[in-house]
Amino acid sequence: SSLSIAMGYNANPLYNYSSYSIFQEPDNSIDVLSIGDSNVYSSIFPLVWWEQQGFTGYTWGQPSQRIPETYEYLKKIYKHQKPSIVLIDGNNLFRDKTDIDNLDSITKAKLATIFPVISFHKNLNPHRLKNIFGNRYSVMKGYYYRKASHKVHKKKHRMKFTRKCWQINKLSASTFSKCIHYCKSQGSIPVLISVPNYNGWNYQKHNALQEIADKNGINFVDLNLELKKQINWKKDSVDGGDHLNIKGAK
């Protein structure tokens, strides 16, 4: 099977090479696009959709991806794909806390779509440059397969109900709205999601994403709540609660 070729690394890659393999897919062949940071490419395994439901998907994600990067990557992806549904992870809305952070991310995002090595300077050796610019087909459809299991040791009420709301920077919110409008203009249905994350998620962030989804007239699906009973944090995480392993993703 395709899974047999996976190595099951324990650490997040500096650069998720398989994301760029979306450009090796036949044009207009992807039904559902998932886009976000390392939580997305660790949690969403598109092959399961194909096996169980018969529709195609691809997961695009880079480590610590910011919302301006999401916007720039969407524009690039839409030159080749017209997905019916776009799942946008909301975790990257919380990374840039100030206007300066946002402006810095916007500049880097525009440059990175033209020169990927600007953002990933540690790849500056012949082998890694080949990974960035070479034509590589991803049998995992962007998913980053990891088999290791490290249980969560923390005991906390991470999803304890509250009406308090996490503050999202206005520039981040504005860029997110641009993502939504762009997806709609291309004929796609954008959906805001949050994937399972024990250590980094809480009800204040849930409330913030629900609020921004309502303002943009889209649905929000919080998998931290939807899959609360299905995820076993003693077995389903690769690193003790930040990212899912293959068992959790399935």
Map each language-model feature to its residues:
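Loop/turn elements at helix/coil->beta-strand transitions in domains of secreted/extracellular proteins
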Residues: 29-30, 55-56, 82-85, 184-191, ...
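N-terminal secretory targeting modules
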Residues: 1-31
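Histidine-centered active-site loop/cap adjacent to the catalytic His
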Residues: 238-250
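Extracellular serine-dependent O-acyl
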Residues: 190-193, 208-234
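Acidic-and-aromatic substrate-binding clefts and catalytic sites of carbohydrate-active enzymes
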Residues: 64-68, 168-170, 198-204
